[in-house]
Amino acid sequence: MPKVILTGSICQHVGGLSAVDVSGTTARDVITTLEASYPALRGWVVDEQGALRRHVKLFRGGEAVSLDAPIAPGDELHIVAAISGG
């Protein structure tokens, strides 16, 4: 089962957890399953049109990946939200 590693402000939407084991065969599947388990996360990673939000990046094995990237059992998918300020 893939492991999702959450950073920064994303953690607050999953009860403060920084890592969660989630099923799925693509990054999109994994995020959909994660959102089903943690409804407060909906809209923070993927927008209403199903696109990755501009301030969020996904990484697998140190490489940036898209929502359509395959995710294998044992992979770690890092969801990283950018920090901004002024």
Language-model features, listed with the residues they occupy:
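Ubiquitin-like/PB1-type beta-grasp interaction modules and other compact soluble beta-rich domains
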Residues: 1-85
